[in-house]
Each structure stands twice: as structure tokens, then as C-alpha cells.
Swiss-Prot record:
Name the UniProt record assigns to this protein: TrfB transcriptional repressor protein
DNA-binding region: 37-56
Gene Ontology molecular function terms on file: DNA binding
Keyword Lipid biosynthesis recorded: no
Naturally occurring in which organism (per UniProt): Escherichia coli
């Protein structure tokens, strides 16, 4: 599965990150526009690792963002209650997935 973000998700992810414009341009190109990382390796003369790191920084930041109306919780529960909470989490994730 390719890593992709909408422009709005991308903007939220980079807010507060201390990254340069080149990193932003690379990450937007790959994550929002769907361009291959190899394109940036060639056009900018960077290593594969440098391009991958630029994309990974923004992708990791995006993973920390919660959808509006959601809250991250940590709890210690009896096994049967934990099972129920995990089902709720799976249902919520499914509802957030874009429809194909």
C-alpha cells in the first residue's frame, strides 16, 4: 500500500515540524502528489536514504494526528473489556478509511 495523504492531512502533519522547504517539497511530492521517491533522488542529486528520511519524517508526524472528534486513551482493563475496546477501535478505523 502506498503512503498517501490529502493536502489537508499534509498541512496538519507539517505544522510545528522544524523542517526545511526541500523536505516539505519532497514529502508533498511523494505523499500528496504520488510521485516516486526515485524522481527526487535523480532530480535533486540526493541519496535514496535522504529522500526516504524526508518522507518518513512527515509520514510519522501524520500518524500522530488524530481525526477531529477523536481522542487517544490508554487504559488497563480486564481481558474481556479490552477485547470490546479493541473492536471499537477497529470499527472507528474502518469508518475513517476513504471509500474506493
Amino acid at each position: 500500500m502506498k503512503k498517501r495523504l490529502t493536502e489537508a492531512q499534509f498541512q496538519t502533519a507539517i505544522k510545528g515540524l522544524e523542517i526545511g522547504q526541500q523536505t516539505i517539497d519532497i514529502a508533498r511530492g511523494v505523499l500528496v502528489d504520488g510521485r516516486p521517491q526515485a524522481e527526487f533522488v535523480t532530480s535533486l542529486g540526493l541519496t535514496k536514504g535522504a529522500v526516504s528520511q524526508a518522507v518518513s519524517r512527515v509520514w510519522a508526524a501524520a500518524g500522530e494526528q488524530l481525526p477531529e472528534g477523536f481522542e487517544r486513551v490508554t487504559a488497563v482493563l480486564p481481558e474481556h473489556q479490552a477485547f470490546i475496546v479493541k473492536k471499537w477501535e477497529a470499527d472507528a478505523k474502518r469508518k475513517q478509511e476513504p471509500k474506493s
